[in-house]
Design a protein with these regions (language model features):
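Beta-strand/loop-rich accessory regions of lumenal/periplasmic or secreted enzymes
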Residues: 237-242, 269-516
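Intrinsically disordered, low-complexity Pro/Gly/Ser/Thr-rich segments with frequent PxxP/GP/PP motifs
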Residues: 209-243
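Terminal connector regions
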Residues: 236-274
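Short, acidic/polar linear motifs in exposed loop/turn regions
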Residues: 190-195, 255, 408-409
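Extended substrate-binding grooves/exosites of carbohydrate-active enzymes
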Residues: 1-186, 190-197, 202, 207-210
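Hydrophobic beta-strand positions in extracellular immunoglobulin-like domains
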Residues: 187-191, 205, 233, 251, ...
Length: 516
């Protein structure tokens, strides 16, 4: 075989009850090949006969892997875990892998599975709307590889590669004082036999989207140890307020093949005072609509629905609306996580009737504040209430605070946040956060910190992205939004961006994030 496969262990049966036939098979295999261990897939019991060399649990949660591997006298290999069902799930891989392999007994695990179990075939008339994909891999039961049937990489492939990387920074962020010579960044070596001296590190220190300086290094580090890399930071004498500083690492092996790439945030230990332009007057006009002007910036709010209906800069409209978002069409992974019973109860929570129950406008010399409460009624079983506080300062910045209280038939929501529609001319989207891949609370090993972007509605931008700030820009101007959460650009409506405080964690073939 051109791939030169190696037999690591012999596997007897699959997810079977333990019978005398299995033990006869185990003893026969060990007699034929006494050099390799034997396991029974799905059997993790510590009372198994001594002829079973390896314990092999399936689809456990991180706490269960931690408990077993922490005291097991036999190696533990999870011969199936983290089912790659669909292209929108695969949550929790990193937590399970680390819980298992942090112990000496945690010998490894195998995701289910490598490749989709079917040829990628066009479907002209779908009986079921399984996804937005025009192709189908046999059916949903065969749509479970980290690569498709043609070996094209999926998002899950990159997550697996990042989680399994044997070399990586042991921290996500580290502090420094501007002007100091260097900082020590711990590098973890999870190789069994390879010293870090054979691994090359290409690094670059960055300020937002800009590379400040870079270098290439190697270091000495024994297997299964942490060694410090001395990163020079003497060039970071001053830091600019409002900017994010971080270092990118790209690790490659002795053949030049990339192992992984990671980012470590560099946090300056100094007070950063952000100066903003201040206009001379804050003008508030109350009529059928409330208009608040601060210099060249103009905001328009509607007392009828409690929402921002327009934002303008120098007479040009940039934002057309801003309203709460707790629902959208569920993707394949989300439907598996919600389950059939909850899907039967689910309704489209975007179709509602709103009524304003409280509205108050306050003005001081330095800011204007609108406080409002709005009830949104879908039907008798589904409604929600949003309390808003819009605050606009003399610098023209709008701060939006909101609290969403729901009473709906389903126990979970796919998204929670605000939906913002910009004008069509703002077709470029950039964000500081994790990219370029989608990121979720329990699935964010592959994306790394940086500034990412592309054309609105394109594959570079669509999907759930972890963000700190995002910008929409174009011929009409620029919108800058700060948010420590997530964003989602709508491929069907590129002008719409969801600014989110929470998203539904990725399930793992029906097992929700909290269950797996």
């Amino acid at each position: 075989d051109i791939n030169k496969p190696s037999i690591i262990y012999w596997s007897i049966g699959n997810e079977d009850p333990l019978t005398s036939l299995h033990m006869v098979s185990v003893k026969l295999v060990k007699a034929l090949d006494p050099t390799r261990p034997v396991l029974l897939p799905w059997r993790p019991e510590e009372w198994l006969p001594k002829e079973v060399d390896i314990l092999a649990p399936h689809y456990w949660n991180p706490q269960e892997y931690d408990r077993l591997a922490g005291h097991s006298g036999r190696p533990v290999i999870s011969t199936e875990y983290t089912h790659a069902y669909g292209n929108d799930a695969f949550g929790g891989l990193e937590a399970r892998w680390k819980a298992l392999t942090k112990h000496p007994a945690g010998a490894g695990a195998a995701v289910w599975m490598w490749a989709d179990q079917g040829v990628k075939t066009p479907v002209r008339k779908k009986e079921k709307d399984l996804s937005e994909d025009e192709y189908l891999r046999i059916n949903t039961a065969g749509w479970d590889g980290i690569v498709d049937s043609y070996r094209n990489f999926t998002r899950d492939y990159w997550e697996t590669k990042a989680v399994y990387a044997p070399v990586y920074p042991a921290v996500d962020k580290i502090s420094f004082v501007p002007g100091q010579d260097s900082v020590r960044i711990p590098i973890q070596n999870d190789f069994d036999f390879t010293n870090l001296s054979s691994v090359k590190m290409a690094w670059s220190v960055r300020e937002d989207e800009n590379v400040l300086y870079s270098g290439t290094d190697s270091m000495y580090g024994y297997p299964h140890t942490v060694s410090d890399f001395k990163l020079p930071v003497e060039k970071l004498v001053t830091v600019r307020p409002g900017r994010t500083y971080y270092v990118w690492f790209i690790f490659t092996d002795e053949k030049g093949t990339e192992i992984t790439r990671r980012a470590v945030e560099l946090c300056p230990q100094t007070e950063q005072l952000i100066s903003v332009p201040v206009c001379r007057e804050l003008l508030v006009t109350e009529a059928d609509q409330v208009t608040i002007e601060a210099g060249d910036v103009r905001y328009v709010f509607s007392p009828k629905n409690g929402q921002l209906v327009s934002a303008e800069l120098k007479g040009k409209q940039l934002i057309k609306d801003l309203y709460p978002a707790i629902w959208r069409k569920l993707n394949q992974g989300e439907t598996s996580g919600f389950g059939k019973e909850n899907l039967r109860k689910a309704v489209d929570l975007t179709h509602y009737t709103s009524s304003v129950t409280a509205w108050k406008v306050e003005k001081t010399p330095t800011n204007a504040v609108i406080r409002t409460t709005v009830d949104y009624r879908v039907d008798q079983e589904n409604r929600f209430t949003v309390t808003y506080r819009y605050s606009i300062g003399v610098d023209g910045r709008l701060n939006v605070y909101y609290q969403i209280l729901t009473k709906v038939a389903v126990p979970w929501l796919p998204i929670v946040g605000m939906s913002m529609q910009s004008v069509s001319g703002l077709d470029q989207v950039h964000w500081l956060g994790l990219g370029p891949y989608d990121a979720y609370p329990n699935k964010q090993a592959a994306p790394i910190l940086g500034v990412w972007g592309g054309t609105a509605g394109s594959p570079d931008v669509t999907g759930i992205k972890a963000m700190r700030w995002m910008e929409r820009s174009g011929s009409e101007g620029t919108i800058h939004v700060s948010n420590s959460g997530y964003m989602e650009n709508d491929a069907m409506c590129p002008e719409r961006t969801y600014i989110l405080s929470g998203v539904f964690g990725r399930p793992e073939k029906g097992r929700r994030a909290e269950e797996s």
